[in-house]
Amino acid sequence: LITIVSEPHTDLWQRTYYGFSNDNAPVLQMKTSNKFFSFTVKTSFNSSALFDQCGIAIYLDSDNWMKASIEYENEEYQRLGSVVTNNGYSDWATHDIPSSIKEMWYRLSRRGSDYYIETSPDGTTFHQMRTFHLDKGDGEISFGIYAASPVDHSFTAQFSEMEVGECKWQPWSAEDTGFKQTASKRLRVYTLHNSKKAVTAD
């Protein structure tokens, strides 16, 4: 069991939309050159202030990293989501869940420089959160756990049931679904008389 008490005014974010850069959230990490593995951890937390967050992270440098966590919003809902930062710009993908949820499992899987995040409310059934790529994530990486409080607040996060093992993200092929690759087709856009557009490929 690892306990982290977050420090006020800590966060990870780079530039996009808000314009600022925050790079001071504590991340407890381990290093690996293994290109095929999965990392699983359970988080428990008592967050109660705006943007309180804890979860998993890959931190390569200030401009290249990812995090997945629950960020507290208010007494009704919080945001389960992920941030991927490549070359100094962050994105943020979320969906709302009840604020009564105070535990979450995360599973991070790696295949080369591509990564896959899953979450689970019970540690048994995992659901896809995101598939993503890190531009500088093909070599040795540092990954682990973090907690942060962007506002003037602090909370306690606990991390347990940590496991690093074989990659649980199975490779996918077009034959699995009968999907045929059509990347070589050229896209053409025609402007119609009513200003609507029809799109065809040949």
Task: Give the predicted meaning of each segment.
Residues 1-187, 193-200:
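Extracellular glycan-recognition regions
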